[in-house]
């Protein structure tokens, strides 16, 4: 069996093109484009790379943005003061807190400081609660991107057995809630480091999502023949054949499972591009909300991504 690649780059390109059309409509209506403010604390190379990639994506979709940099030793007070200013700045529609933060900062406290209507990452407790209660709100970008990839690939969700390996508040837990919600209707098992018999559980999955943060951990014994595999992980691993002596890989051992699965997301080029596309989407929705073009918290997952209206949220 030759696995079908679920192309996140192409999916993100299509989404970005549709977003650009909506940005033009917003400009025509109110004379402004969506504006994303990124907060970067410290100079972690990976975080700097991610922020730069997001800024390039903003430009492609004709959104505006800027990065606010604070030193690694910045205090809670300094970070919260910056966020307060951005909350009050009418030209800013979305605020992104680049994670991880330096160890001395409480990420939950910082994310809570972002105004819910500008929380385009979907990390504020009000947006998390809205997701849990099947109410419209900002959906975290990676789970939103995963569901869009599955739908675009025409993977049946209703009644599907989904196993998610990894229970982070950013991916695993919100994705479990989203996939189990009315409109997706999957049967979801959420696994973690204390799960017993992990391989035996994973091999039952119609859809297996690897989001555990361990390079190439998911091998052939974890995957049922004909399953769909979504790889959320991203790691740099040593590789003497690579130009810089390192290669990107995911949480899945791609070569070990590709012959068994029906479809799989590659790393790179799978989940990552769609995560950024959903960040742009949420930022646009925040701007439309600020302009009075959509009802409060109607910045939901499927608005204008697969031909549905903004109100047709499958909860």
Curated annotation (Swiss-Prot):
Chemical reaction(s) catalysed: (6R)-5,10-methylene-5,6,7,8-tetrahydrofolate + NADP(+) = (6R)-5,10-methenyltetrahydrofolate + NADPH; (6R)-5,10-methenyltetrahydrofolate + H2O = (6R)-10-formyltetrahydrofolate + H(+)
Presence of the UniProt keyword Transferase in the record: no
Keywords, ordered alphabetically: Amino-acid biosynthesis, Histidine biosynthesis, Hydrolase, Methionine biosynthesis, Multifunctional enzyme, NADP, One-carbon metabolism, Oxidoreductase, Purine biosynthesis
Pfam families recorded: THF_DHG_CYH (PF00763), THF_DHG_CYH_C (PF02882)
Database matches in PROSITE patterns: THF_DHG_CYH_2
Example of a GO biological process term: purine nucleotide biosynthetic process
Pathway as given in its UniProt record: One-carbon metabolism; tetrahydrofolate interconversion
Binding, NADP(+): 166-168, 193, 234
Keyword Amino-acid biosynthesis in record: yes
InterPro entries referenced in this protein's UniProt entry, alphabetically: Aminoacid_DH-like_N_sf, NAD(P)-bd_dom_sf, THF_DH/CycHdrlase, THF_DH/CycHdrlase_cat_dom, THF_DH/CycHdrlase_CS, THF_DH/CycHdrlase_NAD-bd_dom
Gene Ontology CC terms: cytosol
E.C. designation(s): 1.5.1.5, 3.5.4.9
Chain's role: Catalyzes the oxidation of 5,10-methylenetetrahydrofolate to 5,10-methenyltetrahydrofolate and then the hydrolysis of 5,10-methenyltetrahydrofolate to 10-formyltetrahydrofolate.
Similarity field: Belongs to the tetrahydrofolate dehydrogenase/cyclohydrolase family.
Protein name per its UniProtKB record: Bifunctional protein FolD
Record gene name: folD
